[in-house]
Every structure is written in structure tokens, then in C-alpha cells.
Curated annotation (Swiss-Prot):
The gene is asnS. One of its GO terms (molecular function) is asparagine-tRNA ligase activity. Its EC number is 6.1.1.22. InterPro entries: Aa-tRNA-synt_II, aa-tRNA-synth_II, aa-tRNA-synth_II/BPL/LPL, Asn-tRNA-ligase, Asp/Asn-tRNA-synth_IIb, NA-bd_OB-fold, NA-bd_OB_tRNA. This is Asparagine--tRNA ligase. It comes from Metamycoplasma arthritidis (strain 158L3-1) (Mycoplasma arthritidis). Pfam families: tRNA-synt_2 (PF00152), tRNA_anti-codon (PF01336).
Length: 450
């Protein structure tokens, strides 16, 4: 019977001595002599390893020099329970085959390797235990997000990656150019910065929809928080207010994080250890703490009371909160998750619903301790003329977005939604401080690997 290491650990209570199993994986370590050899194996299904025990007869059949770190092997043998040992079981090998040898210049070695170096080899870094844990958590979070929306009757829609418009109106789009005289699409085309506008179209027919897709920003930023290509989760709900929007965002985050912790205990244990056992308490506190809703103008007032703490001390109504401000609000003022609502319209996107004061818009940024902004959302502007006027104020061309404007003419119901940067969520759950370490192949300004 072929088994993964994850399956063996899951079924530990039901395992019996001398059961026969077949396993595949990569060598983590190999030690021993001519009489007995211990080979540690990992197959990528878990951060936990399996110890293979080779006795004299099997050792003679293989070249032990080829059992080096990273070598791909197949093994068959009987499982022996070892409850008193460090590992709960081991596989006594009756057959071993080296499927793929490793050159001596394999970049990953037993000694600790820096994250900076591992970023130079994104095609190999997942073969370290740290990145194995990160990517397993990432995959589980993605699964749980789909599960959450399915259980809440949302329809998953596929939005285009190539688009004719800048959905955020910020001019940070990447142009698709085939270098021909005539545009391939007979007009300029861009890599999408958001799927929200297309999601709005489908919400006006399916009521509750969501997208989970790559998005692109031509931001020339070289920070630990920015990527040129990243994944976004963007639900859109017809007949929904800002209050409904915040409620579903809060529920989604807490459900997804809770379920991921439960399903990935070994990976979370490793990551918690690397954060001095502070990661799991932080996440569990978030899961159980009620979200606070705070008006932007109140947040600015509270920041003014503590402005001496900040590098950016020029705090005023109309400013876009910096990362240090967001973290301070969630960590020191609220001491938990907080939704900042009603930002000034001049620092937010054109499609947000304009409040009666004509100065602010019905939107929210959800902030969490340790990372700051995790989600941004809003109630959408449902009034055709208001939307046209706002686009004109921002010099956003109307023609490419006429289809979006026309939605307001054809049975449009008040709509709300939000965007969650998936990599920001992975950072929060894993405790990893650099966004380039939570995506398999990071794309940033100035360089592209693979």
C-alpha cells in the first residue's frame, strides 16, 4: 500500500506493527555504517519526516553515497511502531531504489540557509522545511476560502486577466504589448489590477459571487509588503450594505484561519516555534476577539494624540494612513481587529458610495495587529450621475468603463464587496515578514526570475 507521510501520521492510532507500506520522497539526512543506516525522508505532504531503517542486506544493494540530501527515493518495507522514540514509527526497508541522484553543487545544504539566499533559488527553496510549511499553509488557506464561500452560497466566477480598463483608477497598470504597429486587441490592453468591476456585473444576476485570481500592479516598490503579481480574493454581494460587507469579511477571516490551524497542526507548530511561541496565541486571540468599527475621523484624532510616536508626524484629516499608523491603531489603541470606515473620498477609488457629507465614502479597511491592512472594501456607488461626476473629477475616461456605468441602468441593486490580498493573509497566518517568501515565484519591479 502506497502512503504519504501525512497519511501515516493522521492514521497513527490505527497503525499496527509489521504493516507493509510503500513510500516515495526526498532524502533529508542519511547516517550509519555498514551494518545499519538511518535515512530520513520527506515527501512534501507534511513537515514531518519518516525514518527509514536499512539493515546490512539492503545496504549492500545500494550506493549509500547517493543517499545525499535531496535525492529522490522509493522505499518498501514494514512499519514498526516506536512510541518511546522521538518519532512514533519507522519503516524497516526491504526494498530501496534511488530514483534521482543529487549533484554535489545542490544549493540547499544541511546548514541553515538565509532567506535572502533562498529568494535567489525560488525553484528549490520549497525543499526546506520552512518553505514546505509556508506552502502547505498557503494551499490550505486557499482551500478553506473556497469552502467558506461555497458554504455561504457564493458563486465562483473567472474574471479576465487581460482587460481594457484600470479598475482602481490609480494608473498602476501593466500594458500588454506585442510590439506590433496595431494593437492585438485593436486597443490598449492591460493586466488586470482587480476583478471587482467584472464581479459587480455578475453579482447583478447571481447576487453573491467571488473571484480568486492573480492581479497585477506596476508599483515600483521594493518593500517587504509589495509584489507586482499577487492573488486577490474579491467577493461581491448585491443587496448588501457596508455593514454586511464588514460582517462577511470578519467571518471569512476567522473561519478560514481557525480551520487552517486545525488542519495544519505540525506546520503551525513549526512556525510558532520560529516566532518564539507567539504566533498561535496571536491568531487564537484574533479568532475569538470581536471586531471593532472605528470612524476614520476618530482614528485620526486618536493618532494625533500619539503623533510623537511616529516617523510620519504630519497627521490630518484627508491623509492616507501609513503602515505604522495602521499597526498602532490595531495593536495599541484597539488591541485587536478593527474596521476603519468612512475614509475621505479623495484618497479612495472612484466606485465607492459617496456619503451624505460629500466628503467621505462608505468604505472600510480591516486592520489586524502585526500586519496592518488586510482587507479593503466598500459599498459601491449605485447612482449613475454621481459615478460619472466622480470619474470626471479624477480624469478617468468614461468610454472604456461605459459598460460598468450601464450596470446602473439595468436593475442595479446596491452592491458591496471587498478585496483580500491573499499573500498578506498568508503572511499573517505564517508570521512571515516578507511577502516574497509566501508566494512560490515572486514578481517584483526590476527583476523577474523564471
Amino acid at each position: 500500500m502506497t502512503a504519504t507521510i501525512k497519511t501515516l501520521y493522521r492514521k497513527l492510532k490505527h497503525l499496527k506493527n509489521s504493516q507493509e507500506f510503500e513510500v516515495n520522497g526526498w532524502v533529508v539526512s542519511s547516517r550509519g555504517n555498514d551494518k545499519i543506516r538511518f535515512v530520513t525522508l520527506n515527501d512534501g505532504s507534511s513537515v514531518e519526516n519518516l525514518q527509514l531503517v536499512l539493515k546490512e542486506d539492503e545496504i549492500k544493494k545500494v550506493n549509500v553515497d547517493h543517499l545525499s540530501l535531496g535525492a529522490a527515493v522509493y522505499a518498501k518495507g514494514v512499519l514498526i511502531l516506536t512510541p518511546e522514540a522521538k518519532q512514533p514509527f519507522e519503516l524497516v526497508v526491504s526494498e530501496l531504489e534511488i530514483i534521482g541522484k543529487v549533484d554535489n553543487n545542490f544549493p540547499i545544504q544541511k546548514k541553515e540557509t538565509s532567506l535572502d539566499f533562498l529568494r535567489e533559488i525560488p525553484h528549490l527553496r520549497h525543499r526546506t522545511n520552512l518553505f514546505r510549511a509556508i506552502m502547505i499553509i498557503r494551499a490550505t488557506l486557499a482551500y478553506e476560502i473556497h469552502q467558506f464561500f461555497n458554504k455561504n452560497d457564493f458563486i465562483n466566477i473567472s474574471v479576465p486577466i487581460i482587460t481594457s480598463n484600470d479598475g482602481e483608477g490609480a494608473g498602476e497598470t501593466l500594458l500588454v504589448d506585442d510590439e506590433s504597429k496595431d494593437y492585438f486587441f485593436k486597443q490598449k490592453a492591460f493586466l488586470g489590477v482587480t476583478g471587482q468591476l467584472h464581479a459587480e456585473a455578475y453579482a447583478a444576476g447571481f447576487k453573491n459571487v467571488y473571484t480568486f485570481a492573480p492581479t497585477f500592479r506596476a508599483e515600483n516598490s521594493h518593500t517587504s509588503r509589495h509584489l507586482a503579481e499577487f492573488w486577490m480574493i474579491e467577493p461581491e454581494m448585491a443587496f448588501a450594505t457596508l455593514k454586511d460587507d464588514i460582517k462577511i469579511a470578519d467571518s471569512m477571516l476567522k473561519t478560514v484561519i481557525k480551520n487552517t490551524i486545525e488542519k495544519c497542526p505540525d506546520e503551525m507548530k513549526l512556525l510558532d516555534f520560529l516566532k518564539d511561541n507567539t504566533l498561535l496565541p496571536t491568531l487564537n486571540e484574533f479568532i475569538h476577539k470581536k471586531i471593532t468599527v472605528l470612524d476614520y475621523k476618530v482614528a485620526v484624532k486618536k493618532l494625533l494624540e500619539h503623533k510623537y510616536r511616529f516617523e510620519e508626524k504630519n497627521i490630518y484629516f484627508g491623509m492616507d494612513l501609513a503602515s505604522e499608523h495602521e499597526k498602532f491603531i490595531s495593536e495599541s489603541i484597539v488591541k485587536g481587529p478593527v474596521a476603519i470606515i468612512n475614509y475621505p473620498k479623495d484618497i479612495k477609488a472612484f466606485y465607492m458610495y459617496q456619503n451624505a457629507d460629500n466628503k467621505t465614502v462608505a468604505c472600510f479597511d480591516l486592520l489586524v495587529p502585526g500586519i496592518g491592512e488586510l482587507i479593503g472594501g466598500s459599498q459601491r456607488e449605485s447612482r449613475y450621475e454621481k459615478l460619472v461626476t466622480r470619474m470626471a473629477e479624477l480624469n478617468i475616461p468614461q468610454e472604456p468603463l461605459q459598460w460598468y456605468l450601464d450596470l446602473r441602468k439595468y436593475g442595479y441593486a446596491p452592491s458591496s464587496g471587498f478585496g483580500l490580498g491573499f499573500e498578506r493573509l498568508v503572511m499573517y497566518v505564517t508570521g512571515i515578514s516578507n511577502i516574497r517568501d509566501v508566494i512560490p515565484f515572486p514578481r517584483v519591479a526590476g527583476t523577474i526570475k523564471m
